[in-house]
């Protein structure tokens, strides 16, 4: 558990104080009023009491009854009719499950606009929930973080030990940060604004039933909201926004960050820059992805690799499978149908056939597979020894005879020794200087029968490793029957 910082908390909770009921609050029968009143006062104390609080005289000057003032604040925030009374619509809001971060102060950015001063953030899941398998939790968390990284120049790298920027855990009741959970329903989770100590940490109430679907509280939905706080956003008054404080299920596989959230997060970090070539980061696929027309396109594949006895060609949300020596029977499939964890837009891939494993790269992460079966959660590309300024791989190819993998990044490439498990010295080197006849940006690469095939735009260069020169050039689309 991190040490509680002196400031920068996203969660501001005060002690509950039960005052004498004011007749002006009454908007229910006497039988239900008392329970509504106590529930409402606890809710308002938790979510509508500003840190430090205004002076008592100021509170009285604004409203004869401070609770009426706070009820009106709640009604204004949620777009309700402003009555100052605990009417049915107001009580309906109060009874909804919600985030544990209060609604006071600025509704988009936290006071002082705290934000991270770096663009690579680490995260660690230190405690899991029994409601879901660890693999499901890992997937939901990764997808929730990815929802934000599509809009801003932030990348998230998972670590499995030590102190991360964003520590994630499932907790019960009083868990040591002074903001205890309240059991099933009520407060689902809370997060701390960027900063030292607890800054960025995100806690989920382990008393809830968490799920990847709708039979319980969807972890992706709640996690994506809480990570907005961990990045510096407050609550939004826009009911369509992810940062709206009450729970509303979002389908993880069809989710796109709403406009209000995009504006808020980009006000802190600016937009994510899109460079020529492949997208900087993958996009979550729509329900029915369209098939790229590579037969009439100047674009190349995103990645190419052998997998068993098949060649796989990746483009956007689609991949093609074909037997090496059989150019017929090639059909496209969605990436999610065979690799649900990858979702879309693979940057690079390669297979080490003698070990029976393959590697798939997206942004600063990679996945390991045996055949079409994922082997655990995503890992960081820095495991290979890349310098920190490298945030994505353009292409990768494994060379069987020297047992080395070449990684192409921009105009350069790195050489990784698969036997020693370390990056070779004196790299990176310039690609065009080292591979005679190869030109242009390398989008993908694969080795077959002693030749390296470099995919660059609409061209594929066949490079003879013995002659150390290109021996032919073909259309990239010819590989899938065009």
Curated annotation (Swiss-Prot):
Q: Where does Zn(2+) 1 bind?
A: 99, 225, 229, 235
The chain's disulfide connectivity reads 295-482
Cite the entry's keywords alphabetically: Autocatalytic cleavage, Calcium, Disulfide bond, Extracellular matrix, Hydrolase, Metal-binding, Metalloprotease, Protease, Repeat, Secreted, Signal, Zinc, Zymogen
Q: What is its main location?
A: secreted
Cofactor-binding details, from the entry:
Binds 2 Zn(2+) ions per subunit.
Question: InterPro entries attached here?
Answer: Hemopexin-like_dom, Hemopexin-like_dom_sf, Hemopexin-like_repeat, M10A_MMP, MetalloPept_cat_dom_sf, Pept_M10_metallopeptidase, Pept_M10A, Pept_M10A_Zn_BS
**UniProt EC number:** 3.4.24.-
Enumerate the residues binding Ca(2+) 1: 163-165, 196-197, 199, 201
Modified how: Autoactivates at least at the 106-Asn-|-Tyr-107 site.
Those residues forming the propeptide, per the database entry, are 22-106
Among CDD domains, the record links this protein to: HX, ZnMc_MMP
Q: Where does Ca(2+) 2 bind?
A: 182-183, 185, 187, 205, 208
Recorded GO MF terms:
metalloendopeptidase activity; zinc ion binding
Q: Where is this motif: Cysteine switch?
A: 97-104
UniProt Hemopexin repeat ranges: 292-342, 343-388, 390-438, 439-482
The active site lies at: 226
| Keyword Disulfide bond listed | yes
> Its GO CC terms?
extracellular matrix; extracellular region
Its domain of life reads Eukaryota
Domain free text:
The conserved cysteine present in the cysteine-switch motif binds the catalytic zinc ion, thus inhibiting the enzyme. The dissociation of the cysteine from the zinc ion upon the activation-peptide release activates the enzyme.
> Can you tell me which family this protein belongs to?
Belongs to the peptidase M10A family.
Query: What protein am I looking at?
Result: Matrix metalloproteinase-20
